[in-house]
């Protein structure tokens, strides 16, 4: 994913969000992706790191269980959340589908959460959003 400089001036990594309306670069190296399950209405959160190798899933947690969304056996209950550390290689990109039934994906960083529509500056709608490490244009 290529985008204009995120303007961080630190020579660090950036997260790119690609939507039907363009690409938005965010100067951050870690974030939490949060959403509500469309049927069970249960909150999910994933902590991610942005690396040149791709997006690395560091920790996942869910606030309850439901059909088809059981936490894995290694999950531990901490403050009402089932938490675990997935073991998977960094991914070049993560594709997020959108559903009006579930509400929007929220990206959290620095103590604030915003919807993807708020971040990119236009409604995402039913289109997919791709997340990945920003490469130099």
Predicted regions and their residues:
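Surface-exposed peri-terminal alpha-helical interaction modules
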Residues: 2-3, 86
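Mature, soluble, non-transmembrane domains
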Residues: 71-137
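Extracellular secretome segments
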Residues: 5-16
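N-terminal secretory signal peptides
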Residues: 14-71
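N-terminal short leaders/motifs
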Residues: 1-2, 55
């Amino acid at each position: 994913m290529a985008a204009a400089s995120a303007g961080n001036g630190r020579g660090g990594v950036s997260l790119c969000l690609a939507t039907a309306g363009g690409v938005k670069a965010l100067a951050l190296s870690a974030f939490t992706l949060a959403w509500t399950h469309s049927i069970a209405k249960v909150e999910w959160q994933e902590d991610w790191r942005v690396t040149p190798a791709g997006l690395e899933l560091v920790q996942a947690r869910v606030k309850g269980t439901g059909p088809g969304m059981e936490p894995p056996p290694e999950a531990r209950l901490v403050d009402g959340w089932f938490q675990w550390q997935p073991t998977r290689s960094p991914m070049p990109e993560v594709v997020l589908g959108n559903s009006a039934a579930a509400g929007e994906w929220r990206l959290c960083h620095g103590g604030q959460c915003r919807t993807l529509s708020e971040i990119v500056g236009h409604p995402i709608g039913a289109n997919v959003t791709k997340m990945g490490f920003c490469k130099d244009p």
